[in-house]
Amino acid sequence: MDKKQDQSEENDLFSNIPLELMIEILLKLPAKSIANLIFVSKHWSSIILDKDITELYLTRSSTLPRLLFQVSVSRLKMQFLHSSSLEGPSCDHHRVAVTLNHDLEYRFSPPVRGLICCLNDDIRIIRTEEHQVFTLGAKQEWRMIESRINHKLLSLISFNLRSEEFNVIKFPKDVKHIWSSNLVNYNGKIALTSYSCNGTLDLWVMKDDASKQEWFKDTLSTGELIFAPCFITDPFFFICYDLKEKSARKVVIEGLGDDYVNVSLDHVESPMFLPKVCLSDDD
């Protein structure tokens, strides 16, 4: 029996698995494992690339958000991306190495549905440096978008997926130190944390109607604030503080023995794939 015959019989075995069971298996796997299964057979590939399966996976994954760590190792010119859950950070842990080109400047932002914004089943990828948009399923090409925003100023910018326009959101008037402020998700609303002159941490939340650009100051949350050191400790740890319960807990992450770390919250894994045409040589 040759190799092709063995592979054919194996593919036939997979095809006999009921579709409902196959989908349930896929929904429980890490996104990286699902990506590898595309090469098992055309049958598996057609199931995994189905838009409905992607949405089901994303819905389930959204209930178990993860932490994403960006660790820089200057001596190796490398960055490592670590994905970890809060429930079992040491045992449920993924690591991916990324080679850096130090002729370029890198900025790391919290992920939003991976790297993709979705609107009415149209998937649009935004290349902010050049004001370009790529819409999947359309003409498969980058489109230039006009932007008159002054990028020399530190700004909070929104992008309207319907009108494809950039707009500047004004910061709260009482926030003086913008550079030390951070954007957070407050019950689905845009929120800004900033240190006041008296050393307290203020939480500013944008009202429901974002077009009015009105902020209110709040101190309660059903979630937690994450406090993490900028530089690696041995072992690396961060503090989760529950504003409602006024309690804190320490979470230790093993194996981050490098130089610099940046922590992003609410990372959600997704098996959504980008077509090769939307990626440049540097991506």
Swiss-Prot record:
At the top level of its lineage, which domain of life is listed?
Eukaryota
User: Would you tell me the protein name for this molecule?
Assistant: Putative F-box protein At4g29970
Indicate the segments forming the F-box domain, all copies.
11-60
Species of origin reads Arabidopsis thaliana
- Which SMART domains does the record match to this protein? FBOX
